Amino acid sequence: MKRTVYIESSVVSYYTGRPSRDVVIAGRQQSTQDFWPLLSQDLVPHISALVVKESGKGDSEMARKRLDAIASFGVLATTPEAERLAQAILDARGIPQEYPEDALHVAISAISGMEFIVTWNFSHINNPFTKIMIRQTVENAGYECPEIVPPDAFLGDEP
């Protein structure tokens, strides 16, 4: 059975970005390149209008590459329910108030029943401290919290 994944904007940026000389960024770019074929083979990828909006910003050539990369993905709705959950995540300090878009990524994926959120955002979404608060808030609101992982988490064997 194919697993449902929400692809957050940072993953799209690493996939389409110009090659970096920074060893950490280059490693993430390579992991994302290795992960990307799984999106058509083993996973069912989804994004939101927020990912489309974020992917369309900046240099027009790079924006076109990002938008082309996600053109075939399912687009999840941004509902009032998702907006309320995002606000609850911010209120619980799961994600800092200054980053409401990050909370909305999580909320949209949870409301939509995604199994995973795939992100390189270790600052506000995918770190051990925020993940605890995010999970508690999402579950307290009556939803199952998607597993929050980087792309390279999918590069091993599935049991």
Where are these regions (language model features)?
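C-terminal end-helix/capping segment
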Residues: 126-147
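Active-site neighborhoods of divalent-metal-dependent phosphate/nucleic-acid chemistry enzymes
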Residues: 73-130, 155
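An acidic/histidine-cluster motif and surrounding catalytic segment
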Residues: 68
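General small-molecule cofactor/ligand-binding pocket signal
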Residues: 46, 76-77, 147-149
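Short, well-structured N-terminal submotif of metal-dependent ribonuclease cores
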Residues: 1-47, 54-65, 91-97, 131-134, ...
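A residue-level structural signature of the nucleotidyltransferase/glycosyltransferase Rossmann-like core
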Residues: 4, 44, 117, 146-147
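Residues at the C-termini of beta-strands that transition into short coil/loop
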Residues: 49, 79, 152
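Short, C-terminally biased terminal segments at protein or domain edges
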Residues: 142-159
